[in-house]
Amino acid sequence: MKSILIGLDAFDPQVFEELREKQELPHLAAFADQGSYRHLTISNPAQSEVSWTSLATGLNPGEHGLFDFVHRNPSNYQMLVSLLPTSKSIVGTQFVPPHQAKTFFDQAVEDGYPATSLWWPATFPAKQASPVASIPGLGTPDILGQLGVGSFLSESTDYEQAKYKSRLGTLKREGKQRLTGQLQGPGKMKGGQVEHVMTDFALDLSDAQEPILEIGKDRIVLKPGEWSPIFEVPFKLGRLSSMSGITRAIMPKADSSEIYFLPLQIHPLRSPWPYATPTSMIKQAWQETGPFLTLGWPQDTTSLDEGIIDDAQFLTLCEQIVASRERVFLQQLDQFEEGVLAIVFDTLDRVQHMFYG
């Protein structure tokens, strides 16, 4: 048995058919012409985490238990994020899988075939005992255990935190050509209260065309208006403990001293929670295809909505996310001999959120 599934989140068949008639999607049209083409029934509600879980399990939302982005805790009526349920144990609060239903990935391995799930929604945290190889998609938190917002830092005092979801910060000038700031990291208990760990960074503006971001042990050359490569952000939690996240940075405007960081995301090789399985697979993918963003919603719609980045910068980020997933998929495809290999591309959904309708 050899099955390959390529999922496109928010793919509207009616729009596809209109573009197909105009001969604007020749490759997808060829797939439809060579095989069979059918419309799928839409889940109710028609939400990404509901639809993909129904597709993976063959169950309706009432059976698999995911029926909205927000659920109600029946014990106290508080609202909670359905994709990030937690449980308390002797080791503290831990994330637990958002559903317990059997998927076709599980069925494949029960039947003796390997199965790989790439960026499928509602697959975080990884089930470490499961033989299904997986990289999680929608529902993967940032290193704070939240859905994730970025950090925007500026010399200006005109920005008001109340008007932004993104975390605001101040850049301090040290001489004519140097700015310093801090990134907020995970929290730790101190004196009975949560205190967030901070990491310092600096911007060397000696060359206006290529400012240098100094953070941790890295010196990253920036080009105003362009995204940096993915880099690591270290946080010191205590004498013997530390944590690392990953992010990308951009100086959105060429003529201003402002910098924006994507949400601080899980480093897949140093995750505080079970991120992906098996460890050998994620390590090989990371080292052979290059770093990739790990947040469940990596296309930063918030910063675009708030006017921190512009349309072109957002779309460039989206294209680069697609390219990184393609590299991992093609690497897995090269090794694929039998079983199930599935991947979900969700950038189409994020672009429609911002530009369609």
Which functions belong to the PLM regions below?
Residues L8-D12:
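Short polar catalytic/cofactor-binding loops
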Residues L59-G357:
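His/Asp/Glu-rich, glycine-adjacent segments
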Residues V15-L19, M354-F355:
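Short, glycine/acidic-enriched capping/hinge loops at junctions between secondary-structure elements
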Residues M1-I4:
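Extreme N-terminal starter segment of soluble prokaryotic enzymes
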Residues Q14-V15, Q94:
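Second-shell loop/turn segments in exported
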Residues E17-H64, T116:
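Short, structured active-site-proximal loop/turn typified by the sulfatase FGly-forming signature C/S-X-P-X-R
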